[in-house]
Regions:
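PLP-dependent amino-acid enzyme catalytic core
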Residues: 1-207
């Protein structure tokens, strides 16, 4: 038998808390600034576009450990723990004594780590009484993750995807729609910002999707 390459936790070993590194940093990052007031962003500022609990966690610099809600952790068990893989071939190619590992996130339903955050965000939105979520996405991974999470927690989802990316990766938007999301190429005429952009540069509305 060759050396062990994959290391996988059992379901009952999946962490029960998220780690907030800011709490342990001696030199903490500069605060986010409100673009209107130029003052440090408050939880109330962020809560205008994100749910309150995630806004609070985003600005928390005191608590190192945050409990993972049990419904979120339960959803994690469907695809976590993802394998931790020892990259022996890369170590050999680099001729290094260091041990190199990578996390294989391709085994989860959406193929990226973004579902981990999307599930938590949609859970908190549901708990706070939100009925629908709206997001942007570039290549489509985040849009797919949020669409899936919204479906899990009974929310409606609207996704605005960069129009050229939507054209180049048509199956990503198909995945989002499979989970019940509405998907629109951006810029579009359905938003004020999109109308302004297309008015200034009309050819942007001609990209086929």
């Amino acid at each position: 038998m060759s050396k062990q390459k994959k290391f996988i936790l059992q379901e009952n070993e999946i962490p029960t808390q998220w780690y907030n590194i800011q709490a342990d940093m001696v030199n903490k990052p500069l605060p986010l600034l409100n673009p209107k007031t130029k003052q440090p962003v408050t939880v109330e500022d962020l809560a205008q576009i994100f749910n309150f609990e995630c806004s609070k966690q985003e600005l928390d610099t005191q608590h190192a450990w945050i409990d993972i809600p049990e419904p979120v952790r339960e959803m994690y068990t469907y695809y976590r723990a993802t394998p931790l893989v020892r990259a022996y071939a890369l170590e050999k190619a680099l001729d290094t004594p260091a041990h190199i590992y990578f996390k294989n996130e391709s085994v989860n339903p959406l193929g990226s780590h973004k579902i981990n955050s999307a599930l938590a965000q949609c859970y908190y939105c549901k708990q706070e009484g939100t009925t629908n979520v709206t997001t942007e996405t570039g290549a489509g991974q985040w849009g797919a993750a949020l669409s899936y999470a919204a479906k899990v927690f009974g929310l409606e989802a609207a996704v605005y995807q960069v129009k050229i990316s939507m054209q180049q990766k048509p199956y990503r938007s198909s995945i989002m729609r499979t989970f019940g999301a509405t998907v629109e190429g951006s810029p579009s005429m359905s938003t004020r910002a999109g109308k302004d952009i297309i008015t200034r540069d009309p050819h942007l509305s001609l990209i086929h999707i």
